[in-house]
Amino acid sequence: RATVDRALRLIEQGALDQAGIEALAERLGIGGRHLTRLFRRYLDTTPLAAARTARIQRAKRLIDSTDLGMTEIALASGFGSVRSFNAAFQQVYRRPPTAIRRRAAG
């Protein structure tokens, strides 16, 4: 479980935003398949899904606490494009990020 906790900390710091699972696993001293198995065993998810969740949470915090534009938030949160940011955000919150910001402001 300690390896999964370390992996989660690295993911929250953006470890999978630029590199893949193999690079993260190497930093942890294990193989990528083993890392994925550990995530499934302890968290019932995958490292990529955990990274996506971390990016969405990071974006939500930025929406709530800054006046940054959505493009800046998408990139600062680790998304490769505004389109992927909008799609992921809408899937989780069932509304686009701009609607969340309007709701928070109103």
Language-model segment annotations:
Residues 2-56, 60-86:
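DNA-binding recognition helix and immediately preceding turn/loop
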Residues 87-106:
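…primarily DNA-binding HTH/wHTH and HhH modules…
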